[in-house]
Amino acid sequence: MKLTCMMIIAVLFLTAWTFVMADDPRDEPEARDEMNPAASKLNERGCLEVDYFCGIPFANNGLCCSGNCVFVCTPQGK
């Protein structure tokens, strides 16, 4: 009986301690780029111009500025 009461008290104490010591997320930045704005610039990629190698061919792969890739970036059809 005493052991059960001590275990219950210990669990309640540790639970309360966790809530008291937890960080308040309202004071922190919301997005990763707000945490370290310089790092977000590393993720920005430029597109490849016409006649540059773009890899596996498929439309709108995001590598070519024109959006057309057939092993090399091709100009947009008009």
From Swiss-Prot:
Signal peptide stretch: 1-22
Cysteine disulfide links: C47-C65, C54-C69, C64-C73
Pfam families membership: Conotoxin
GO molecular function, one term: toxin activity
Prosequence residues removed at maturation: 23-45
Assigned keywords, A-Z: Amidation, Calcium channel impairing toxin, Disulfide bond, Ion channel impairing toxin, Knottin, Neurotoxin, Presynaptic neurotoxin, Secreted, Signal, Toxin, Voltage-gated calcium channel impairing toxin
Protein's cellular compartments: Secreted
NAD keyword on record: no
Domain of life: Eukaryota
Keyword set includes Transferase: no
GO CC terms: extracellular region; host cell presynaptic membrane
InterPro entries listed in its UniProt record: Conotoxin (IPR004214), Conotoxin_omega-typ_CS (IPR012321)
Residue positions where Glutamine amide is found in the record: Q76
Tissue: Expressed by the venom duct.
Protein family membership: Belongs to the conotoxin O1 superfamily.
Function summary: Omega-conotoxins act at presynaptic membranes, they bind and block voltage-gated calcium channels (Cav). Acts on high voltage-activated (HVA) calcium currents in molluscan neurons.
Domain notes: The presence of a 'disulfide through disulfide knot' structurally defines this protein as a knottin. The cysteine framework is VI/VII (C-C-CC-C-C).
Protein name: Omega-conotoxin PnVIA
Native organism: Conus pennaceus
Upper taxonomic lineage: Eukaryota, Metazoa, Spiralia, Lophotrochozoa, Mollusca
